[in-house]
């Protein structure tokens, strides 16, 4: 298998990823700003399928209408010249100080109304550029102190905002769905909708739930100490995996945004295995930050590494699934039984079945080994290149 990516692999990058200048809370930028046109051209050369953006990534905040149109025109020309697509867009509702207390859930009503108008304006651009998914990350929606935010009212306002946005895209006839991106712990101390589970529960309360799904990110779920592939599996099970952000993370700490494959490599293997086996057809979107130690050559090497690592893990996962010893180990672990209904015969027959309870040999069942260690070691062998 070739590890050289092509557009058919559907790899995408945000302008803000390779465009991150290395500025953090403790240090200034270490790299110059990248022109979005340059980003499109370089990513196309690397084999990417598309590029995504926040409104302020493409059009500097405060630009006049004339300046805005000029930025859009140059960007569109770069897309046309390279064949790159824009499968997703989003709104920056977190950088400007006006959003210091949030956007859709800010205590100030006028800020909430401004946030909705800012979002709607960029939705129009997203639809114009062909995006099918609109991501919403509520990074400033939350609090640091208990009395500062009535969470129930804040969730009411969050619901109101998404219902209005759903009404808007429906009224405009846009073929666009929303993907809510959960994240815990930063930048607000306590953020609303911090995990996939929170977001899935919230979506069920919306007026048009079919328009809303989730955009899980590797590092975000791991920041909460959760299993990312399990979160992805539940989103798939619910029919709500509308988009996905791939990067690397090493356990419960700040949002590292390492290149994909760095950090928890075992989790990355199972995530790729799941996406490929489940038939996920959306973009494989990399939301990472090239370390501030790197110059621009290092930025592009980091982006290329994201795609290469995905393709290597895709090959490793396929070899694992095709290995006859693995298939035997899966049977020994009785995974095939998990796929069978527990009581397809119905409640009445279950209650009448003495083998299910009265005559069930608890001790014999307890003594049965599950053979999980053999199965897991085979996975490790494939991951480490010792098999296949």
Curated annotation (Swiss-Prot):
Cofactor (UniProt): Mg(2+)
Keywords for this protein: Carbohydrate metabolism, Cytoplasm, Isomerase, Magnesium, Metal-binding, Xylose metabolism
Active site: 54, 57
One Gene Ontology molecular-function label: magnesium ion binding
Note accompanying the cofactor annotation: Binds 2 magnesium ions per subunit.
Database matches in InterPro entries: Xyl_isomerase-like_sf, Xyl_isomerase-like_TIM-brl, XylA_actinobac, Xylose_isomerase
Any Pfam family: AP_endonuc_2
EC assignment: 5.3.1.5
Residues that hold Mg(2+) 1 according to the record: 181, 217, 245, 287
Biological-process GO terms, alphabetical: D-xylose metabolic process
Enzyme class label: isomerase
Location of this chain's protein in the cell: Cytoplasm
Positions with a binding annotation for Mg(2+) 2: 217, 220, 255, 257
Chemical reaction(s) catalysed: alpha-D-xylose = alpha-D-xylulofuranose
Gene Ontology cellular component terms for the protein in this record: cytoplasm
HAMAP family referenced in this protein's UniProt entry, alphabetically: Xylose_isom_A
Similarity comment text for this entry: Belongs to the xylose isomerase family.
Subunit architecture: Homotetramer.
Protein name per the record: Xylose isomerase
Gene: xylA
